[in-house]
């Protein structure tokens, strides 16, 4: 795992999305996502508009079980509808995750990294090592690349932040890299 992947793995574990565990294809997962959308958009009308379906379609998706008159299963969204629903709900969950992440990144404590670290172009005698980078550090610059999923930029941004903290250029190499903070 390179520095970008290690940083992303730590951030994903530290700031979970809050998305329901149940898949959107299950009644439970679908209703949970619909509830989140209705809460965020002020009711069924706003939620249906955000997903891009009519209010009537939204109402039918809400129903579960079987129709009492016909005994047939109620209408559920197809693949395209589920993609729309999951995408719109995902934005809601990512926004909440973003708020938590930005607050946590502003006051990261006990920042550590493990890997082959070049300080100003030089390797230490024992190249693979764990370094306590800082007791407290502002890592808000990591948020943008993490949100975009840009691993290369995320790794470079982390290296630059650590370099600023130590007034030195650093480069983390190798595939056995770890990053952590509290």
Stretch-by-stretch model annotation:
Residues 42-52:
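Short alpha-helical "recognition helix" segments of helix-turn-helix
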Residues 94-165:
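Helix-turn-helix/homeodomain-like alpha-helical modules used for DNA recognition
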Residues 6-10, 33, 84, 88:
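Charge-rich, solvent-exposed alpha-helical interaction surfaces
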Residues 156-182:
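Long, low-complexity, charge-rich intrinsically disordered regions
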Residues 20-42:
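Short, amphipathic alpha-helical "recognition" segments used to contact nucleic acids or chromatin
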Residues 73-94:
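DNA major-groove recognition helix of helix-turn-helix/homeodomain DNA-binding modules
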Residues 1-22:
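N-terminal flexible/basic segments that precede or flank functional cores
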Residues 52-76:
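Recognition helix of helix-turn-helix/homeodomain-like DNA-binding domains
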């Amino acid at each position: 795992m390179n520095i970008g992947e290690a940083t992303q793995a730590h951030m994903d574990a530290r700031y979970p999305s809050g998305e329901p565990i149940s898949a959107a294809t299950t009644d439970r997962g679908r209703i949970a996502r619909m509830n989140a959308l209705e809460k965020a958009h002020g009711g069924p009308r706003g939620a249906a508009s955000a997903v891009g379906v009519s209010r009537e379609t939204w109402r039918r998706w809400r129903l579960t079980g079987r129709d009492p008159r016909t005994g047939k299963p109620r209408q559920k969204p197809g693949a395209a509808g589920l993609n729309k629903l999951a995408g719109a709900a995902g934005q809601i969950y990512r926004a909440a995750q973003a708020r938590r992440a930005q607050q946590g990144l502003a006051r990261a404590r006990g920042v550590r990294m493990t890997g082959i670290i070049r300080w100003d172009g030089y390797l230490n005698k024992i190249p693979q090592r764990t370094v306590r980078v800082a007791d407290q550090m502002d890592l808000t610059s990591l948020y943008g690349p993490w949100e975009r999923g840009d691993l290369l930029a995320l790794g470079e941004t982390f290296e630059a932040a650590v370099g600023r903290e130590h007034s030195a250029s650093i480069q983390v190499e190798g595939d056995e890299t770890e990053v952590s903070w509290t």
